[in-house]
Amino acid sequence: MGEMASLRSHKNGIIFILDIVLFFVLLNVLPFEPKANSGLALLAFIAVLWLSEALHVTITALLVPLLAVALGLVSTKQALVGFADPTIFLFFGGFSLATALHIQKLDKLIANKIMALARGNLFIAVIYLFLITAFLSMWMSNTATAAMMLPLAMGILSQLDREKDHNTYVFVLLGIAYSASIGGMGTLVGSPPNAIVASNLNLTFSDWLWYGLPIMIILLPLMIGILYIIFKPKLHLNFEQTFENIEMNPMRILTFIIFPVIALTWIFSGKINPFISGLLGLQKNIASFDSIVALLAAIVICSTGVASWKQIQSNTDWGVLMLFGGGLTLSAVLKDSGASKILADSIVFMIDGQHFYLIGLLVAAFIIFLTEFTSNTASAALLVPIFISIAQSLGMPEIGLALIIGIGASCAFMLPVATPPNAIVFGSGQVKQSEMVKVGFLLNLVCVVVIATMGYMFWLK
């Protein structure tokens, strides 16, 4: 392991040095205005680091404002304003809610209660397992959901013969990983790429539901169907149910009240915001209302003792929030320097005149297979602003390509390293990489077609 770490460190060092060389070469040889040259050189430097992960993606995100200021592209205040974007606080509220569910064991309680409805029928239990995983991933991190659901699944599968029923094991375990990824598409707080798209296009929580939820509802049964066709699991069996006994107490009841109230306020913010603004005597609706609700959620959760600040702190992925900030700063710098227009015009030159559906297919295939090897959050942070500019240059609705990038970034099903849920189920030792690649490649292709088709029919018009 030490030798592998040393090799990786050596490789990352070489990539970093070459990236610095590339940065200075581009800064001095690009034929555009000095400001645009600086923006493009910065983009190339950050892109190499984000895609190669030669530096941790969060550290790379923190380099964005530092270099933007050093290059004279923005002031310090402008460089850091992205780190206080309302979407960051909305996502923080999502982390707070997820912490409350986890600390009070309501995630397990929900899973156990619904699984009990299967009454020992394996087929029904497996379908419930996938649906619960997808639902919880809409509100919790995909990683935490997959990690929580894996022991529940293994408890059921332990009653089967590992050799004889190997395909059933693979069907269930891959189904959990993929359900977690697909479920994360459903809400704005479900997955970081969703929030990156929303922050670039000023989408609210309820706006996102119109885009993410239909894709989730379409992909979930398609995923289950593909897994079933390929692995032909034996699901006609019965099993004995043994679940952890989690009793209701005042704190759990309070959490059960807080969670739906906050979720429904986000969903119906379009109606609730004017009502509350009127009650407060405000002339206009509260701006970034979803983020204000998210802050209220964190305050209520802490002040009622449902979860402590330390627990929220340790369950919040601060690196992801910093990555949001770096991505938003990069987006603003590219736009202000003219770099995004130059880049967009170059790509438009190659694809101008092509059918919008073909463009959607190409973009979906590009992002889905790219995120098999790169961080989906970093890829979205890098590409969403660029593809918004490309859409504008092509005369397409800017939301179309941005949504294809944002949702496609969550569709990495082929490799264990592609997403944490994939890695978690692969780590069980019951799934071979060849099995994941086989079904994942097919599922990736289905996602390309579904996302491009939905994009063409509803987002690119």
From Swiss-Prot:
Membrane-protein topology: Multi-pass membrane protein
MF-aspect GO terms: succinate transmembrane transporter activity; transmembrane transporter activity
Subcellular location: Cell membrane
Keyword field: Cell membrane, Membrane, Transmembrane, Transmembrane helix, Transport
Recorded superkingdom: Bacteria
InterPro entries attached to this UniProt entry: Na/sul_symport_CS, SLC13A/DASS
GO cellular component entries: plasma membrane
GO biological process, one term: transmembrane transport
Keyword Transport: yes
Bilayer-crossing regions: 13-33, 54-74, 81-101, 120-140, 170-190, 211-231, 256-276, 286-306, 314-334, 349-369, 377-397, 399-419, 439-459
Pfam families in alphabetical order: Na_sulph_symp (PF00939)
PANTHER family on file: SOLUTE CARRIER FAMILY 13 MEMBER, SOLUTE CARRIER FAMILY 13 MEMBER 2
Family to which this protein belongs: Belongs to the SLC13A/DASS transporter (TC 2.A.47) family. NADC subfamily.
Protein name: Uncharacterized transporter HI_0608
